[in-house]
Regions:
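Non-catalytic cap/lid and distal C-terminal segments of serine-dependent acyl enzymes
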Residues: 19-337
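N-terminal signal peptide c-region/cleavage motif recognized by signal peptidases
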Residues: 13-15
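Compositionally biased regions
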Residues: 3, 17-18
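Sec-dependent signal peptide recognition
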Residues: 1-7
Length: 337
């Protein structure tokens, strides 16, 4: 009897150990060239660092194919921060491991590094930043499908992002329903039109290298201008600010407004109807973002477009890791093939 019990215990321990090893995915760091990013006036490399999370069974499964979630990080952030290389409020591989261990369906997670000279690409197409929309939806997706065992169809692809990444997910998602079938927006920034107010600190900057030394909101002005009001004839910044000599510039503000999802969404309603699932959330203490997400919820309701909308007690970052693990990943597990 004792030998039998000991044998069973040994088998249990061995089985547990095997499971512990199996539930940890593998992380790869690759470079994916963007032809549409070549020659950007910021001078950023078109060879972008990309992090790829492969689920635990990927190596051993042989021919199995997996759904893919393309995850976009926020402004001033980088892949190194989101992937746990540098201390940050989130560690994607750890969170995905935990979600899969809790029963969430296995999937591949892909994050391109969109940190640029002006601290963030805004995931927009511009002569100054390069064509980031096309890079994400066309070039990156094509590369991942060619080099990994993916479900190479829109029904197996999701697009998500936080803050600037949430903006990018909606912007790109509205234009590429043939590429993705599910969207999730985490505290998406920049939904509403606006250019703020005159910023004397921004007007005092004439060297691109000085942008990195500026405060967060001044950096955001330059990133937004590079994406939405580029100017190839205005070196060395190659952009137009929405203010000049302390006065707002209506023509530039109009360009910024044209890039606000709440301003452009009406023309993309047929595309949004193509999505199997759309989710979005924001912390109640994250203003004005929570307010604009609520407005987006109202617009989608007006058009009778099915979606999930949730607010929670939190600010812009303090519960993002938890939300990714417990809401976003299960959302895609339920909606992707």
């Amino acid at each position: 009897m004792n030998l039998t019990i000991i044998g069973l215990l040994l088998l249990t321990v061995a089985g547990s150990s095997a499971q512990d090893v199996a539930r940890h995915g593998a992380v790869q760091r690759i470079q994916v060239h963007g032809k549409g990013l070549e020659g950007n006036l910021e001078g950023d490399s078109p060879d972008r660092s990309v992090a790829v999370y492969l689920p635990p069974s990927y190596k051993s499964s042989g021919t199995r194919r997996y759904p893919v979630v393309y995850l976009l990080h926020g402004f001033t952030d980088s892949v190194d921060q989101w992937w746990g290389v540098k201390p940050h409020f989130i560690n994607v591989p750890v969170l995905v491991d935990q979600a899969l261990n809790a029963g969430v369906k296995e999937m591949i997670i892909v994050m391109p590094d969109a940190f640029t000279r002006y601290q963030g690409s805004m995931y927009s197409n511009s002569v100054t930043t390069g064509d980031w929309e096309d890079y994400i939806a066309r070039e990156l997706v094509a590369y991942i499908d060619a080099h990994y065992r993916t479900l190479a169809d829109r029904t197996g692809r999701g697009l998500a992002g936080h803050s600037m990444g949430g903006y990018g997910a909606l912007r790109i998602g509205m234009k590429y329903p043939e590429v993705f079938s599910s969207l999730y927006l985490m505290s998406p920034c920049c939904l509403a039109a606006g250019g703020g107010r005159p910023n004397t600190k921004a007007e005092a900057i004439h060297d691109p290298a000085d942008v990195a030394k500026a405060d967060f909101f001044t950096k955001a002005v330059f990133a937004s201008a590079a994406a939405w009001s580029p100017n190839p004839r205005n070196p060395p910044l190659f952009l137009d600010l929405p203010f000049k000599n302390g006065a707002m510039q209506p023509q530039i503000l109009a360009k910024w407004a044209a890039n606000a999802p709440l301003a452009m969404i009406d023309q993309f309603i047929p595309n949004l109807r193509e999505y199997k699932a759309i989710g979005m959330d924001a912390g109640t203490k994250d203003q004005p973002i929570a307010g604009t997400v609520e407005t987006l919820d109202g617009v989608l309701n007006d058009y009778a477009i099915g979606h999930a909308y949730e607010t929670y007690d939190g600010n812009h970052i303090n519960r993002v890791a938890e939300r990714l693990e417990r809401r976003v990943l299960p959302f895609f597990a339920a909606n992707l093939d």
